[in-house]
């Protein structure tokens, strides 16, 4: 194990559930995190903010929290701000990094200004003339395209659009989830990868090969036919450089401690970063446990390592 006395952590709340579209994933993540911490002898307890007021954390003597909430207020800076107010240390990024990390639009603006490569994109606002915007966007970006709400995670409501005729309906659907919709040029030819970060540890890259069109919600959490390639098959020098860029993509957003950065490669091997995740899934389908396991780090050891980062705050 980590060599840290479990008593140093004090009473720990595992935050999971919540009220976002990712509630069910969070419940699964949280239960596994809870068991992993308990397996290491840590005094960990379940806590669902959808069912109990956050003030109970302070009232009941919790001193730190493992945030296994996904999406919504669990990942957009709100829970982080509340925990700061109550003086409870927590895993993952603070208010700024969490808020930026969940907002794909502002993430891309920061990356454009700091030299992190990201696919060309356009934004559409809820209520725009979707047919007119679709014509303009196809002329600028071509096809195929990805349409996604700016602030949903786990690929919720993400659609791949292959024809101009299908774009207006995709825009309308995405706009029911967020007032800002991102329309992104699809990067083809080199595959999808993720870089998992845990403190000073850059875990091995994972190449994701979904059975369907792309790595959507079903492929992430339901299907058993998605392939996860570790090692990812890239030359060592290229993998090292991609890890460096992933770390920069994470850092320039103000993200800290642990998370994930997802990117595509084109046919020439150029990387284009899609998003970061500041509270990654921790289910049996999730990527950080897979990456850790590939280098001999067990699930329990990983969650203890993540929680141990709160000792350094």
From Swiss-Prot:
GO process annotations (BP): cell wall organization; peptidoglycan biosynthetic process; regulation of cell shape
Protein name: D-alanine--D-alanine ligase
Keywords (A to Z) from UniProt: ATP-binding, Cell shape, Cell wall biogenesis/degradation, Cytoplasm, Ligase, Magnesium, Manganese, Metal-binding, Nucleotide-binding, Peptidoglycan synthesis
UniProt-annotated binding residues for ATP: 138-193
Alphabetical list of PANTHER family matching this protein: D-ALANINE--D-ALANINE LIGASE, D-ALANINE--D-ALANINE LIGASE B
HAMAP family (alphabetical): Dala_Dala_lig
Catalytic activity: 2 D-alanine + ATP = D-alanyl-D-alanine + ADP + phosphate + H(+)
Pathway, per record: Cell wall biogenesis; peptidoglycan biosynthesis
Subcellular location per the Swiss-Prot or TrEMBL entry: Cytoplasm
Residue positions binding Mg(2+) 2: 275, 277
GO-annotated molecular function: ATP binding; D-alanine-D-alanine ligase activity; metal ion binding
Residue ranges constituting the ATP-grasp domain according to the UniProt record: 108-308
Gene3D superfamilies from the UniProt entry: 3.40.50.20, ATP-grasp fold, A domain, ATP-grasp fold, B domain
Binding locations of Mg(2+) 1: 262, 275
Main location: cytoplasm
Enzyme class label: ligase
The protein's role, per its UniProt record: Cell wall formation.
Organism of origin: Burkholderia ambifaria (strain ATCC BAA-244 / DSM 16087 / CCUG 44356 / LMG 19182 / AMMD) (Burkholderia cepacia (strain AMMD))
SS bond partners: none
InterPro entries for the chain: ATP-grasp (IPR011761), ATP_grasp_subdomain_1 (IPR013815), D-Ala_lig_Van_CS (IPR000291), D_ala_D_ala (IPR005905), Dala_Dala_lig_C (IPR011095), Dala_Dala_lig_N (IPR011127), PreATP-grasp_dom_sf (IPR016185)
SUPFAM superfamilies listed in its UniProt record: Glutathione synthetase ATP-binding domain-like, PreATP-grasp domain
Cofactor-binding details, from the entry: Binds 2 magnesium or manganese ions per subunit.
Family to which the UniProt record says this protein belongs: Belongs to the D-alanine--D-alanine ligase family.
């Amino acid at each position: 194990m980590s060599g840290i006395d479990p008593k140093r952590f004090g009473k720990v709340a595992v935050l999971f559930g919540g009220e976002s579209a990712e509630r069910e994933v969070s419940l699964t993540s949280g239960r596994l995190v809870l068991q992993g911490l308990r397996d290491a002898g840590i005094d960990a307890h379940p806590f669902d903010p959808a069912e109990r007021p956050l003030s109970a954390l302070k009232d009941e003597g919790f001193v730190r929290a493992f945030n296994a909430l996904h999406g919504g207020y669990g990942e957009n800076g709100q829970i982080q701000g509340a925990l700061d107010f109550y003086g409870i240390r927590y895993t993952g990024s603070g208010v700024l990094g969490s808020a930026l990390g969940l907002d794909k639009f502002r993430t891309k603006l920061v990356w454009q200004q700091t030299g992190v490569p990201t696919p060309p994109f356009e934004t559409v606002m809820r209520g725009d003339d979707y047919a007119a915007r679709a014509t303009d966007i196809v002329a600028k970006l071509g096809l195929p395209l990805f349409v996604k709400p700016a602030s949903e995670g786990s690929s919720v409501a993400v659609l791949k659009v292959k024809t101009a005729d299908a774009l207006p309906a995709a825009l309308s659907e995405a706009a029911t989830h967020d007032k800002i919709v991102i329309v992104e040029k699809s990067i083809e030819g080199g595959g999808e990868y993720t870089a998992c970060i845990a403190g000073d540890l850059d875990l091995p890259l994972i190449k994701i090969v979904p059975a369907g069109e792309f790595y959507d919600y079903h492929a992430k959490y339901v299907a058993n036919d998605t392939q996860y390639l570790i090692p990812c098959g890239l030359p060592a020098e290229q993998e090292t450089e991609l890890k460096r860029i992933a770390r920069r993509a994470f850092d320039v957003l103000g993200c800290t401690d642990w998370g994930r950065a997802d990117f595509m490669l084109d046919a020439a091997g150029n990387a284009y970063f899609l998003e970061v995740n500041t509270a990654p899934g921790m289910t049996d389908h999730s990527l950080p446990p897979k990456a850790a396991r590939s280098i001999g780090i067990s699930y329990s050891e990983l969650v203890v390592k993540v929680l141990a980062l709160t000792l350094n705050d």
